[in-house]
From Swiss-Prot:
Protein name (Swiss-Prot/TrEMBL): Probable DNA-directed RNA polymerase II subunit RPB11
Entry keyword annotation includes Cytoplasm: no
SUPFAM superfamilies to which the protein is assigned, alphabetical: RBP11-like subunits of RNA polymerase (SSF55257)
Cellular component aspect of the GO annotation: RNA polymerase II, core complex
Entries under HAMAP family matching the protein: RNApol_arch_Rpo11 (MF_00261)
Organism per entry: Caenorhabditis briggsae
Amino acid sequence: MNAPAAFESFLLLDDKKIYIEKDTKVPNAAIFTINKEDHTLGNMLKIQLLKDPEVLFAGYKNPHPLEHKILLRVQTTNATTPADALTTAITDLVGELSLLEHRIDSAIKKCTQSTDTERGYN
């Protein structure tokens, strides 16, 4: 079979997680190659980047279904760099995901408490 071994989808081995390449076709742009990631992270980063008013363009692609990497292209205004915009987007995503985790934990706790009360455990 032509498919790579399953472990190749998540083990970095001696490879770097991210490579940055300046995009010479457009001003103030870069292409980030993020290894061992897929559409989940690519779409989250793209959406978060597009919320930033300093980001003019953000898009990603997976070059091939059997390659476990994404190419994220970012173009910004002169007020910031693509790397800074990506760092800000990642920081904002971590905050949003932490808030989501907290809300889920609270909802589970509330549901468990109400179920325990209904069953007479409290």
